[in-house]
């Protein structure tokens, strides 16, 4: 029983330390990755390429990813550099 409690404690501790983020996937040009003309599985495969858990083509017609690692770039309106913006 104590091993089980220890296991659960470690599990929750790891879950609190490992943080993931959600957001729009960013291309090399700083713009959101568009998916309007792509196949249905395109966003999910692009999100998994950067170690995200899942993704889909959102209403803005851009790939939205879930549970991406902190090092993965996501689109942010404050740091938007799409089409030369700063």
UniProtKB/Swiss-Prot annotation:
MF GO annotations: sodium channel inhibitor activity; toxin activity
Keyword list, A-Z: Amidation, Disulfide bond, Ion channel impairing toxin, Neurotoxin, Secreted, Signal, Toxin, Voltage-gated sodium channel impairing toxin
Compartment annotation: Secreted
Entry keyword annotation includes Disulfide bond: yes
Expression across tissues: Expressed by the venom gland.
Chief location category: secreted
Signal peptide: 1-20
InterPro entries the record matches: LCN-type_CS_alpha_beta_dom, Scorpion_toxin-like, Scorpion_toxin-like_sf, Scorpion_toxinL, Scorpion_toxinL/defensin
One record GO biological process: defense response
Family under the similarity heading: Belongs to the long (4 C-C) scorpion toxin superfamily. Sodium channel inhibitor family. Beta subfamily.
UniProt protein name: Toxin Td8
Organism name: Tityus discrepans
